[in-house]
């Protein structure tokens, strides 16, 4: 009997530890290197503001978090590190506005600014490890690829290049040239980087050597990041098209567009099981069957949606440019609750330790919970 009790106690402890890791760490602004936007925890109901922290200007960056530290950039040029009580741990001045989200790699914060500089900072105290300079602004969050003893940071720039940087030293490994601005983040699967550009292509690049694997024509600007799932990429475009690309065959499997509006998809999609979800500037959030492209439901949020949604096994968390935070039922798109923050929200929130963390145009970083 005592042995059974010990085994059960250990199982509970393991579950608790796993759950704790899941709730306190959100190291990539979309949750993982495939940029799927999937949350394996529940989203709180009946939320209210628990605290807010005022920065010096608009917050367009999405939050990331690790070890109870929240990292977010502001257009005042600072990277802010807050604890879960909303108190400042440290801040770092990058010298120019930050619109990109950060990446937490190991115990370091990687983030770019509008001067085109990419910084590596120590998570604990914000001390600079290195600075890498591109030739134009960085709007996208970096991503990380590791193989053996090599770790590379991948980030696009408005200098038309995808930059590959040694994560430890900050030295450039290679550059891949596109034909226009790179606004979106890179999605990564195995040895492949997948990203869209303002040149109208979805690029597939081999990470170890930086060589082009393929360019798939989307035919218009791709401002948002793609997400990857089971050998397929899902991405929206500036003309209001939403595409599913077979990465093995290197061709478009299906494409959907709303001919009535034709407004851009700025947001990145989220995927869970057979559903893929994305918001549009026409105020709607769309849910498609990821295999067929069939429209399963759409929901009018009341204002344009630039921020990417987050998805759980049953719910969708989305924000809009009116300043609303909405929780939708994944099954049918029904609005379960909405909270009026009152200031436009540019980028996706994070859910950390049962709390929703999000930045807004009014310069505040908000924490909402039960």
Predicted regions and their residues:
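Beta-propeller domains
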Residues: 75-77, 82-84
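Short loop/turn segments that connect beta-strands within beta-propeller blades
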Residues: 83-87, 122-125, 166-169, 206-210, ...
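Short, tryptophan-glycine- and acidic/Ser/Thr-enriched carbohydrate-recognition patches
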Residues: 35-39
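Extracytoplasmic beta-rich repeat domains
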Residues: 23, 30-33, 45, 51-64, ...
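Glycine-rich phosphate/oxyanion-binding loops and their immediately adjacent helices
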Residues: 73, 87, 112, 196, ...
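Bacterial Sec-dependent N-terminal signal peptides
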Residues: 1-22
């Amino acid at each position: 009997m005592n042995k059974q009790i010990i085994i059960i106690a250990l199982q509970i402890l393991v579950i608790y530890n796993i759950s704790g890791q899941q709730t306190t760490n959100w190291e990539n602004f979309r949750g993982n290197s495939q940029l799927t936007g999937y949350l394996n925890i529940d989203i709180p109901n009946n939320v209210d503001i628990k605290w807010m922290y005022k920065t010096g200007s608009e917050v367009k960056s999405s939050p990331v978090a690790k070890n109870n530290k929240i990292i977010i950039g502001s257009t005042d040029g600072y990277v802010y590190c807050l604890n879960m009580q909303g108190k400042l741990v440290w801040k770092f001045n990058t010298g120019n506005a930050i619109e990109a989200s950060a990446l937490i790699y190991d115990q370091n914060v990687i983030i770019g600014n509008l001067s085109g500089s990419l910084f590596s900072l120590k998570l604990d105290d914000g001390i600079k490890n290195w600075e890498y300079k591109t030739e134009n602004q960085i709007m996208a969050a970096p991503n990380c690829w590791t193989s053996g003893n090599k770790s590379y940071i991948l980030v696009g720039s408005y200098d038309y290049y995808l930059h590959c940087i040694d994560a430890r030293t900050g030295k450039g490994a290679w550059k891949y040239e596109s034909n226009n601005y790179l606004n979106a983040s890179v999605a990564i699967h195995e040895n492949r980087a997948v990203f869209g550009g303002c040149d109208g292509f979805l690029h597939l690049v081999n990470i170890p050597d930086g060589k082009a694997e393929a360019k798939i024509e989307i035919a218009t600007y791709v401002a948002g990041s793609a997400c990857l799932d089971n050998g397929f990429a899902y991405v929206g475009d500036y003309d209001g098209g939403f595409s599913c690309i077979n990465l093995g065959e290197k061709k478009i499997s299906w494409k959907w567009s709303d001919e009535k509006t034709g407004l851009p998809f700025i947001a990145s999609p989220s995927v869970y099981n057979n559903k893929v979800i994305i918001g549009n500037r026409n105020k709607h959030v769309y849910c498609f069957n990821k295999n067929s492209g069939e429209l399963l439901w759409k929901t009018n949020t009341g204002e344009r949606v630039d921020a990417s949604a987050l998805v759980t096994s049953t719910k969708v968390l989305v924000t809009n440019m009116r300043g609303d935070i909405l929780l939708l039922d994944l099954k049918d798109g029904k609005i379960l609750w909405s909270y009026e923050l009152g200031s436009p929200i540019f980028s996706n929130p994070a859910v950390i330790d049962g709390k929703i963390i999000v930045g807004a145009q009014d310069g505040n970083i908000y924490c909402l919970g039960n």
